[in-house]
Amino acid sequence: NPMYNVVSNADLVDFKNLLDHLEEKMPLEDEVVLPQVASEQNEEAGAVLSALPEVPSWPGEAGPAQREGGALGRGPWDSSDRSAPLKSKLRALLDAPRSLRRSSCFGGRMDRIGAQSSLGCNSFRYRR
């Protein structure tokens, strides 16, 4: 898969650290919050957030110490020349019509016809 060649090991380590951090922040599935308590918490959070000043956008959030070092001695996740092609490829994939994402040969209709006759490049997807 050509996608594996684009992502560096350092980026994978950053993704892993981010995932670990998010998993620590997520509540356990065993914890059940009553709807009334949840709505009260939402109201309290809304009141607190409305009292806070406007926060700058994400690229401007990193302070000078984060820009120079970061946790792993690397720069932050900013829009660098290295990540720009990856972002554009991901954006193009998300913006592509569903049939283009699904099919690698002729299109959805031809793939279904090929699957019925065991011909075509994506016949394994539609077997029943």
UniProtKB/Swiss-Prot annotation:
The record, for Pfam families, names: ANP (PF00212)
> Which PROSITE patterns did the record assign?
NATRIURETIC_PEPTIDE
Q: Which residues form the propeptide?
A: 68-78
Gene of origin?
NPPA
Its PTM note reads: The precursor molecule is proteolytically cleaved by CORIN at Arg-98 to produce atrial natriuretic peptide. Undergoes further proteolytic cleavage by unknown proteases to give rise to long-acting natriuretic peptide, vessel dilator and kaliuretic peptide. Additional processing gives rise to the auriculin and atriopeptin peptides. In the kidneys, alternative processing by an unknown protease results in the peptide urodilatin.
GO CC annotations on file: cell projection; cytoplasm; extracellular space; perikaryon
Q: Which family does it belong to?
A: Belongs to the natriuretic peptide family.
Name a biological process GO annotation: cGMP-mediated signaling
Q: Tell me one GO molecular function of this protein.
A: hormone receptor binding
Looking at the record, which segments are called Important for degradation of atrial natriuretic peptide by IDE?
Answer: 122-126
Q: What is this protein's name?
A: Natriuretic peptides A
What disulfide bonds does the UniProt entry report for this chain?
A: C105-C121
Q: Positions of the region Disordered?
A: 36-84
User: Which residues, renumbered to this chain, carry the PTM Phosphoserine?
Assistant: S104
Q: Mind listing the UniProt keywords for this protein, alphabetically? A: Cell projection, Disulfide bond, Hormone, Phosphoprotein, Secreted, Vasoactive
Q: Which domain of life is it from?
A: Eukaryota
Show which residues form the site (Cleavage): R98, S99, C105, F106
